Amino acid sequence: MQAIPFNPARDVIVPRRKEKEGQKLKYLDDDNLKKFLTYLEQLPNTYKNFYDTVLYKTLLATGLRIRECLALKWSDIELKNGTLDVNKTLNIIKEITGPKTKSSIRVIDLDNKTVLMLRLYKARQSQIGKEMGLTYEKVFSNSFDKHIDARMLSFRLVKHLERAGCPRFTFHAFRHTHASILLNAGLPYKEIQIRLGHAKLSMTMDIYSHLSKDNQKNATSFYEKAIEKLKSS
């Protein structure tokens, strides 16, 4: 065989990867969210099920990325004041690193039900720790207070979704669902951006603007009410 004196692929134009603009954002709609939460409430009262339930509900209530959540220590959560400090993340080899971006460093307010749930979870975790001679520092650790593998938790999530009769999705769907709930409740995009830790407001708007269906539908009624108020004044 003889060597070709030129590269035949030199002038080949490699097609650019298409943007994911048309890709559907995965989140739990109202029906599937209700179905999944009902399923969680009916699980046998084992610590493993309680752990999973608290993890899912914490993600849903805060919009945290899964690796931000798995990096949490109890010292990051002020149960008395109802705040959660996001300042680190857990990488794929279970090492603690800095957050994704500077804007990812944030303090999130917790609702009362989530605070109560975390109090109950901490008490149950502490009881198990006493039996094992451990004091748990990490919120979502394994039995020995070591960081847990997110991939194993993903496998458990898939099993729960199948049993609940819900479509399959990843942990990130909880984040999208959180944003969707806040958006349709009327929270401004800027507040959602800060809560999610997005670097730019445009990022939040690009990702979630099409989820504001309720707000879009309400726009006409807001207009009608404004006109009627103007007429009657």
Regions found by a protein language model. Give the residues of each.
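Basic, Lys/Arg- and aromatic-enriched nucleic-acid-binding interface segment
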Residues: 4-6, 10-72, 80, 104-105, ...
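C-terminal secondary-structure termini that scaffold catalytic or DNA-interacting sites
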Residues: 81, 94, 99-105, 112-114, ...
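Catalytic-site neighborhood detector that most strongly recognizes the C-terminal catalytic loop/helix
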Residues: 27, 90-92, 196-222
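Generic beta-structure capping elements
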Residues: 15-17, 87-89, 113, 143, ...
